[in-house]
């Protein structure tokens, strides 16, 4: 439920829950076997301090949360969404994207909203746009391939309606701070299109799900299992 990153010989840990929610950031040094508390509060259920979008500041910090999506890029750690607290005292699904720079010990709010339960702005499929943003969600799977980050699924908000399971695929470019909707429906609760076993097809798409597992191999994105809010899947998908 907490978020972990690895850069060099250090591991970074943020947030999580024990029925209350945390926003403390810790660093563990594998060389010295020591922990360091870097940022955030030692009090639970804290709201985020967003500051100005795109501007790093010592006062910025994400709100307490769990089940966020994460990746690393250019020796910085990134945090997207999750279930937690916005800039107020309200808890819900988030779609904010944050960058933490270990060199400065500062957070930067990059994109998304400082509110909860925001709907997605998908734009046109396969067309990058500065106005695009995935809907708020928890448990989406994020992986980086060739300096681009890919986000699949989770449980949250599509372009309309209430909370549901998602099966949209997004690309985020850290160099431009722009999102692109690549595949999958822009609505929630959709069944998948499996096609023929082992055969790639443009019409194929995994069913909507969350709590899935993902990894990369040879510049491909793999998704395994997950749940539609009940029985669990045991399918493996390659993108």
Give residue ranges: language-model regions.
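Kelch-like beta-propeller repeat domains
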Residues: 1-239
């Amino acid at each position: 439920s907490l978020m972990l990153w690895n850069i060099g010989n250090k591991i970074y840990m943020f947030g999580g829950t024990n029925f209350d929610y945390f926003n403390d950031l810790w660093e563990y040094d594998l060389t010295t076997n020591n922990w360091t508390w870097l940022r955030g509060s030692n009090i639970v259920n804290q709201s985020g301090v967003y500051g100005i979008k795109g501007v790093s500041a010592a006062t910025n910090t994400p709100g307490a949360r769990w089940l966020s999506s994460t990746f690393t890029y250019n020796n910085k750690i990134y945090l997207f969404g999750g279930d937690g607290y916005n800039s107020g005292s309200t808890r819900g699904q988030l779609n904010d994207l944050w960058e933490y720079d270990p060199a400065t010990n500062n957070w930067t709010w990059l994109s998304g909203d400082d509110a909860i339960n925001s709907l997605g702005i998908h734009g046109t499929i396969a067309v990058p746009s500065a106005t695009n943003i995935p809907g708020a969600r928890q448990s989406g799977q994020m992986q980086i391939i060739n300096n681009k980050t890919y986000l699949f699924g989770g449980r949250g908000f599509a372009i309309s309606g209430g909370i549901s399971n998602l099966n949209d695929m997004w690309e985020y470019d850290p160099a431009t701070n722009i999102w692109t909707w690549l595949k999958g429906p822009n609505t929630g609760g959709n069944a998948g299109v499996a096609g023929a076993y082992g055969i790639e097809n443009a019409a194929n798409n995994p069913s909507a799900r969350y709590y899935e597992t993902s990894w990369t191999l040879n510049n491909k994105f793999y998704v395994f299992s997950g749940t539609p809010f009940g029985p669990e899947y045991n399918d493996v998908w390659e993108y």
